[in-house]
Every structure is written in C-alpha cells, then in structure tokens.
C-alpha cells in the first residue's frame, strides 16, 4: 500500500501567505514610524516589545513541534508516525523564524538606548546591587553567545532529525538490522535534542529573553510556565494542520484516534499551564514580597488586568469545558475552533509577559500604551511565514 503524502501548497495559499507577510512588514514599518523612530524611550520600547513578543512566541511554538517528535520518539510513541511529516514541516520553520528572532534579540541587547533590557546599561548595573549580583548571567556577551548557540542548535538538530526521517523515502530499510540501526540513531538524536531543549526552553532561554525584562523579579516556575504555554499552542498548531490535510484527502492512515490523542495533549497541557499559572501567582501573592509582587501588580490589578484574566478564561475555562468530552476531541469543527482559540490565548499570554515591564512608568505606575492593531498585524506577518 502507498500513502498519498506529497502535498503541494495551492497557489492561493502561497498568495495568502505572501499577503500576510506584506501586512506584517508594513505593520513593522508603521510601528517604527509611529513609535520606534521617536526619542522617548517608552515609545521605542513599544516598537521593540511588539517585535520581541511575536518573534519569541512564534519561534517557541514551531520549535515545540520538534520537541513533540523527540519526546514521542524516546517514549516509543509509534502513534504519531502517520502524521510525523506534519510536525517535521512545522519544525522546518525554526531556522527562518529563529534567524529573525535572533536578529531582533541582538539588536535589543546592543541597543544604545537600553529600551527593554535595562541590565545592558552598565551605569544602571553599577548602581543596582541586585543587577550586580546577576551580572554573571545577565550580560551582553553571554546573552548574545547563548542566543546564537540556542537558535543554531535547534535548527541543526531539527535539520538532522528531518534528514534522517526523509532518508526512508529515498532508501527504505532493507533488513531488520538496518531497522535497528535507524531506530537507535533516531533515538540518540532525539535524546540529544531533549537535553538541549531542557537547557534552553525549560531553563535559561525564558530567563534571558523574557524574565530579564523585569530583571529584579524571579520565579522558579517561569521556564516551565513558558514551556507549557508554547507547547500547548504548538499542539494546537499540529491539530490545525492535521485537520486541514485530512479534509484535503491526505494522511489516509491518520484517523480520529490520532486527533483524539492530539486533543488530549491540548487538554492536558491546558490544565498543566493553569496549574503553573495559579501556583506562581498564589505563592507570590501569599508571600507578599515586594520584589515579587511588582511583577503581578500591573498585570492582575493594573491596566493589563483585562488581558490577564481574559487569557485565564481562554486558556483554562474554555479547554476544560469543551475538550473534556471525548466527542469534542474527535470533532473537526470543535478542534479547529479550540486550536485557534488556544493559539490566540497563549499569544495573549506572551503579550502580558513582555509588555507591562517596559511599558510601565515605574514612577507613576501607569502604562504608556494599550494593545493596538499593529500588534495583530505583526503577528499576521509571522503567521504568513
């Protein structure tokens, strides 16, 4: 039997993708003219925060696809093989979005105005004991080096695993011994990727790229929280592609059982995200330490409170009410709706991770700017990629 796997993107979708990228590029230009080119630091921060928010979010989401491949490979999860090309195709976006994200991060890090990362200003560090103590980790050299290493590692390891997988198309396994060697090599590279993933996404990268915007604040749950947010959005993206391809007549060996399992991941990690969301908030609220509560004050009680509580409804209430039922996880329309909702909900999550820090006047406690259409337009550009 043969599987109809070769998918040629219809011209109309190429046109839509190009249109979305043009919209994103025009939005970046417009945002630069209206905010980035101004002298006020908070106006410049508005521009760079929009780029950081979208580039980091979409990079971590597409990178979650390769984590899913590696984790299921190590767990001997053969059920995902029928749609593995889908997850591989999503992970193939990592080099492109990673390059864009890396350039944005390095420009922010070495910006002479220190618009997002105040720890890059040597004068600020010299006058701040907390930043002095963290300077061994929060410094430009380590930030740049680890960022470049991380994006290269994700890209190269993903390329290696995709290359091994595609080799089966050109040269099928001829013997049982060849099959054993392939499984062994695939398992080894998956294990290497998981180790790199643990050292980056599950620890250092959220600290460097996101939490260092509020450099005084700290949370031992933050990296896991960031991982949960990006991974559940990544599973939602996988679900969207599976549903689209099934409706187009592809993935003949992928059935509602597979979609059900993907839906279980979406449901389970929505609960896991909520556990981390609540635990982080509850422990900081209970301890009432000024260094910790300053992070949540503008988010839970200030101008960002609407987004803060809305994402709780989208990312927890909706999944637990809709995806708990077995039938919902097997219904294409319901899964499509929930996948889109989850991707948007965690886009909001990353928005409130990035914006309140640089956009809050710490002297008055007021925010400088609300969410605007430019934010959605920039996101559309990354969707087009």
What annotation goes with each model-predicted range?
Residues 55-172, 190-194:
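Transmembrane-helix bundle segments that line or gate the permeation/cavity pathway
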Residues 11-13, 120-129, 314-385:
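TerminUS-proximal long segments
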Residues 1-9:
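Short, Lys/Arg-rich, polar N-terminal cytosolic tail immediately upstream
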Residues 92-111, 268-277, 337-346:
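Hydrophobic alpha-helical membrane-insertion segments
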Residues 48-54, 83-85, 215-226, 363-377:
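Non-cytosolic membrane-interface motifs at loop->transmembrane helix junctions
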Residues 60-69, 99-104, 147-159, 228-243, ...:
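Hydrophobic cores of alpha-helical transmembrane segments in multi-pass inner/ER membrane proteins
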Residues 31-50, 71-80, 169-170:
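Membrane-interface helix-loop junction between the first two transmembrane segments
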Residues 11-40, 134-311:
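Long, contiguous internal "core" modules enriched in hydrophobic/ aromatic residues
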């Amino acid at each position: 039997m043969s599987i109809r796997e070769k998918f040629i993107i219809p011209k109309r979708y190429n046109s839509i993708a190009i249109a979305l990228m043009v919209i994103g590029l025009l939005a970046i230009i417009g945002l630069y003219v209206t905010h980035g080119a101004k002298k006020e630091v908070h106006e410049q921060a508005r521009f760079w925060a929009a780029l950081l928010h979208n580039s980091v979010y979409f990079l971590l989401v597409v990178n979650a696809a390769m984590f899913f491949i590696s984790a299921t490979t190590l767990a001997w999860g053969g059920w995902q093989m029928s749609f593995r090309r889908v997850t591989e195709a999503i992970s193939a976006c990592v080099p492109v979005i990673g390059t864009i994200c890396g350039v944005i991060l390095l420009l922010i890090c070495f910006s002479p105005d220190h618009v997002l990362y105040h720890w890059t200003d040597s004068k600020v560090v010299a006058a701040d004991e907390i930043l002095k103590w963290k300077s061994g980790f929060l410094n430009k050299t380590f930030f740049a080096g680890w960022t470049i290493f991380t994006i290269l590692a994700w890209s190269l390891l993903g390329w290696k695993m995709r290359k091994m997988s595609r080799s089966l198309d050109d040269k099928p396994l001829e013997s049982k011994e060849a099959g054993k060697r392939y499984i062994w090599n695939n398992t080894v590279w998956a294990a290497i990727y998981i180790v790199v993933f643990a050292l980056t996404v599950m620890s250092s990268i959220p600290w460097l790229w996101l939490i260092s915007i509020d450099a005084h604040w700290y949370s031992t749950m933050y990296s896991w929280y960031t991982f949960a947010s990006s991974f559940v959005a990544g599973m939602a993206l996988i679900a969207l592609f599976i549903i689209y391809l099934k409706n187009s007549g592809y993935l003949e060996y992928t059935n509602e059982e597979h979609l059900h399992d993907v839906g279980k991941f979406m449901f389970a990690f929505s609960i896991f995200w909520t556990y981390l969301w609540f635990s982080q908030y509850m422990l900081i609220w209970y301890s009432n330490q000024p260094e910790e509560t300053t992070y949540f004050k503008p988010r839970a009680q200030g101008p960002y409170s609407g987004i803060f509580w809305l994402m709780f409804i989208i990312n927890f209430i909706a999944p637990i009410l809709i995806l708990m039922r077995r039938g919902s996880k097997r219904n294409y329309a319901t899964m499509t709706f929930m996948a889109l909702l989850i991707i948007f909900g965690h886009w909001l999550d990353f928005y409130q991770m990035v914006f309140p820090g640089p956009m809050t006047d710490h002297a008055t406690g007021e925010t400088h700017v609300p969410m605007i259409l430019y934010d959605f337009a920039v996101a559309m550009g990354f969707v087009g990629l």
